[in-house]
């Protein structure tokens, strides 16, 4: 399933994120904020249980999360800021890291780092990466997690290309995709058009 998060606040901040005149500091802040906002949609079906708490004036019934263990796994390096935004809302989530880069010649992902919680196979995992372009990195990261025994995975990105969505759905049809926008296409270099450029470079001021 593909879920487009079209909340007005998300779309407002996404428009500013795309702007080529947005500098690294504001870009990081916007990505952080969009990721936090998108998490509400991603987690809206988490199980809850009813509890009672004592207020200064009496007893109130309420709901709390029902022991759903979560992990957030950013694809390095651009996914780091997204993970930070989500951790602000879910500070109890564990964090893993998967390092992948795209070979400029083949456009295939190359793995260079993986560090995951020991109990990752017992957790619902949210994989985050700002861009779903060719889909290669997302497919590779999710394959790594499944090899570790993870069964419940969601993928969250800011902008996606139709080609990347198709690739990910063909490889992992059980993984829901959350995105703030589906753009037109990929160019010959594997970049999303119109997109926002290279998210990692814009985040960290590199080229």
From Swiss-Prot:
Regulation: Allosterically activated by GTP.
Coiled coil: none
Keywords (A to Z) from UniProt: Allosteric enzyme, Glycosyltransferase, GTP-binding, Magnesium, Nucleotide-binding, Transferase
Cofactor needs: Mg(2+)
UniProt keyword GTP-binding present: yes
Sites where the protein binds 5-phospho-alpha-D-ribose 1-diphosphate: 77, 102, 129-137, 198
Pathway annotation from the record: Pyrimidine metabolism; UMP biosynthesis via salvage pathway; UMP from uracil: step 1/1
Pfam families per record: UPRTase (PF14681)
Cofactor note: Binds 1 Mg(2+) ion per subunit. The magnesium is bound as Mg-PRPP.
NCBIfam families given in the database record: PRK00129.1, upp
Family membership: Belongs to the UPRTase family.
Name the record gives this protein: Uracil phosphoribosyltransferase
Organism: Dictyoglomus thermophilum (strain ATCC 35947 / DSM 3960 / H-6-12)
Gene name, Swiss-Prot/TrEMBL: upp
